[in-house]
């Protein structure tokens, strides 16, 4: 299983949110590049980055900082937030980004996902964010009546390789991941499933690993010290 240390960005700074609420944003480190280098030193090969300003503004905002990580470290970068058009995907694909995560557009504009997968293949992943099993969009500010499994199956049928599943009620809470939903999703589709939200300690990592998940995104647990990144990477080798 892959471990994805996370950097969420507002105003060019690394932050974390509680349950996706922008009013709870807390800066968690001094700067992005130094933080990314610390992940490399811990043995990470990937990093999960989110342009939170982009999520709200529905356009790329912090893309320069994200591209800098791809070009100034050895990390493979996956990026989500504010990606609404093919030109956004083009930009990241041509600037060293290894995976582009389509979120809100998966529900609102599935034709874009289809076109993107056709052109970029496994570079494209889909982020499914859910509250009580139903998909939320636009930086989690809008709900829907679409069940997360239904959206996942639709994405699978379009050829999407990787799905990042976030349980919003767990995100930034350090209360453990929603293992039940993750296992249900992993069994329902053939896509690689990455867990996001609630990962707290090494036991969570081992549980996700033993349930056959592809990856785990770790944010607040690293910054608050409840998870040792070096150990997390070691138990997943």
Protein language model regions, located:
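Conserved anion-binding
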Residues: 12-15, 19-23, 97-171
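Structural preference for beta-strand elements that scaffold enzyme active sites
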Residues: 2-6, 46, 74-78, 98-101, ...
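Conserved, mostly hydrophobic/aromatic
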Residues: 8, 39, 47, 92, ...
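Glycine/small-residue-rich loop that forms an oxyanion/phosphate-binding "nest" at active or ligand-binding sites
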Residues: 53, 58-118
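Charged helix-capping and loop-helix junction motifs
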Residues: 60-67, 141-150, 175-183
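Catalytic cores of alpha/beta
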Residues: 73, 77-96, 180-215
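Glycine-rich, proline-tolerant flexible connector loops at the mouths of alpha/beta enzymes
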Residues: 46-62, 104, 165-175
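Glycine-rich phosphate-binding active-site loops on the catalytic face of alpha/beta enzymes
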Residues: 94-112, 197-201, 213-229
